[in-house]
Amino acid sequence: MGSTAKLLIQIVVCLNMIAAQESELLCKKTGLDFKSFQEVVHVTSSQSDVLDNWQGFKRSGEPEAVRRQRADVFAKSLAPALELAREIGVSIPGTALAQRLLKKVLDID
């Protein structure tokens, strides 16, 4: 059960990464201060550690090769969850989408 829980944690983290990146993008485009948005979300039911620490989490200042490697690790970490879902006949399209979007989310592509 521990390994299954780890797979599910990776799904939650990666989907939260997508939500954080898209929220940041929309904040920038609409003029909403992202830091203020994070503070508001922190006290709501949509709070997430990934969103709370997004600027540090995505590490935009690191070399692209390092960010690319991190994105690859996150994408690979979703493969076992996708395989398990296929084996038990469960559709998890959000996870499949997250796997494809991770490089964009981490400012690589």
Model-derived regions, located:
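Helical "substrate-binding/catalytic lid" subdomain
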Residues: 2-94, 99-109
